[in-house]
Amino acid sequence: MGARGALLLALLLARAGLRKPESQEAAPLSGPCGRRVITSRIVGGEDAELGRWPWQGSLRLWDSHVCGVSLLSHRWALTAAHCFETYSDLSDPSGWMVQFGQLTSMPSFWSLQAYYTRYFVSNIYLSPRYLGNSPYDIALVKLSAPVTYTKHIQPICLQASTFEFENRTDCWVTGWGYIKEDEALPSPHTLQEVQVAIINNSMCNHLFLKYSFRKDIFGDMVCAGNAQGGKDACFGDSGGPLACNKNGLWYQIGVVSWGVGCGRPNRPGVYTNISHHFEWIQKLMAQSGMSQPDPSWPLLFFPLLWALPLLGPV
């Protein structure tokens, strides 16, 4: 082929290589997370402060609040699978968006700040094991553009095991849902926060075997609340985070999934246990962010084939 031919071939092959992955997706779940600026009504809860839960978002359909959501990275957020169960065509996510960095679930139509922190959803992924009932109630949403981090918008941490959080009494759940079973969150629809205790699954199963309503607590669930009731997630909080602090960083250990009423005694809220889905989350985020072959690379070889006969030895 000669030196000129070899040089041309090398240039074409270099151009035909794999495209670089998007920088925000190259290392999922590995960047800084779980930090917040503010350190200081879900049922029995109180108004939150802006920046206290910077990973909290509002999953919206045609700009109406549907569920809570938590930010994991620049392009990924976590919610509950049942938030989408009445919407059959998830291959078309048009109309779905996520709002971050706002205390209210109903920001003003004229708010530029809300407009610039609203991100359309490009893909929706339900757990492949979700069958429309309680177990495996978890979903990932991929955003169409990278989220800009600010002091009011930050990702939360995840980890493969949540065993160390069992029996903690100082975890928190946040959301814009009902403040009582029969009372919606009033205007100005401010994000609510409430402190809850983690209840081990053996005790939780025992509680749900009592009385007339029986419900099984599966291995991928975690319960939180208190024996007296009054502190719980409620309708509209679904998909939001159950978070605990560890060494100054916040970790999401659960996703709001279901409950019997809201804040009833001996009826804790039930959450999807993140640790049972950590590998699925990690793999999906990594696979979706992998390099893809440039679809134009085969076309680059046609000029090469045409030029080779013309390239003699130097």
UniProtKB/Swiss-Prot annotation:
Residues 20-41, 289-314 form a propeptide. SMART domains: Tryp_SPc (SM00020). It is a lipid-anchor; GPI-anchor. One of its GO terms (biological process) is proteolysis. SUPFAM superfamilies: Trypsin-like serine proteases. Residues 42-286 form the Peptidase S1 domain. Disulfide bonds join 33-157, 67-83, 171-244, 204-223, 234-262. The active site is at 82 (charge relay system), 137 (charge relay system), 238 (charge relay system). GO terms for cellular component: cytoplasm; extracellular region; extracellular space; membrane; plasma membrane; side of membrane. Its main location: membrane. It is found in: Cell membrane. It comes from the Eukaryota. Its EC number is 3.4.21.-. It comes from Homo sapiens. Pfam families: Trypsin. Keywords: Cell membrane, Disulfide bond, Glycoprotein, GPI-anchor, Hydrolase, Lipoprotein, Membrane, Protease, Serine protease, Signal, Zymogen. InterPro entries: Peptidase_S1_PA (IPR009003), Peptidase_S1_PA_chymotrypsin (IPR043504), Peptidase_S1A (IPR001314), Trypsin_dom (IPR001254), TRYPSIN_HIS (IPR018114), TRYPSIN_SER (IPR033116). Could regulate proteolytic events associated with testicular germ cell maturation. The keyword Glycoprotein applies. Residues 1-19 form the signal peptide. A lipid is attached at residue 288 (GPI-anchor amidated serine). Belongs to the peptidase S1 family. Glycans are attached at residues 167, 200, 273. One of its GO terms (molecular function) is serine-type endopeptidase activity. The keyword Cell membrane applies. This is Testisin. Expressed predominantly in premeiotic testicular germ cells, mostly late pachytene and diplotene spermatocytes.
